[in-house]
């Protein structure tokens, strides 16, 4: 009985992640290979979702809740993991302070996502995010350009 429940949860998690991947693909075809490069692995010890660069690990309850409550947030979480891998954040830490590295990489990835003006990933930026991006741009640590319009 318990094995059947775990199998069902795994199928549902895979379906949620595949649906999220497909929605992102519709808007970002240039990320085709990157979006499709992960195996999906159920892992109740994970807090939400995460990746090691090859697999996306997910807590079934957290994944289902995120998908049900806010599809944009789900899309952003998936894209966040993909961008971490594309930018080699998973493999380039070397001797750097782990906490500082992770926060810096998260800010870099979220900045990219926040400045791609696509409905499927759009969330209103908080004042804190705007202030941080402004400070980093003034220090020339990130460059934020306005999107070009046809």
Name these PLM-found stretches.
Residues 114-136:
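Short secondary-structure capping/junction motifs at helix and strand boundaries
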Residues 51, 148-149:
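Ser/Thr-centric signal marking residues that sit
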Residues 142-148:
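Conserved small/polar residues in nucleotide/adenosyl-binding loops
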Residues 1-74, 78, 82-119:
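Basic/hydrophobic alpha-helical interface regions
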């Amino acid at each position: 009985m318990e094995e059947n429940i775990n199998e069902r949860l795994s199928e549902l998690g895979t379906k949620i992640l595949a649906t999220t991947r497909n929605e992102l693909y519709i808007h970002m075809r240039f990320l085709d290979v990157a979006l499709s490069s992960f195996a999906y692995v159920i892992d109740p010890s994970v807090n939400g979702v995460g990746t090691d660069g090859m697999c996306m690990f997910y807590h079934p309850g957290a994944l289902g809740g995120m998908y049900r409550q806010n599809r944009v947030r789900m899309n952003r979480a998936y894209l966040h993991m993909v961008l971490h891998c594309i930018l080699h954040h998973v493999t380039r830490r070397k001797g750097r302070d782990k906490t500082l590295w992770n926060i810096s990489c998260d800010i870099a990835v979220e900045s990219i996502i926040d400045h791609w003006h696509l409905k499927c990933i759009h969330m209103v930026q908080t004042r804190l995010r705007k202030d941080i991006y402004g400070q980093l741009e003034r220090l020339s640590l990130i460059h934020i350009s306005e999107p070009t319009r046809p």
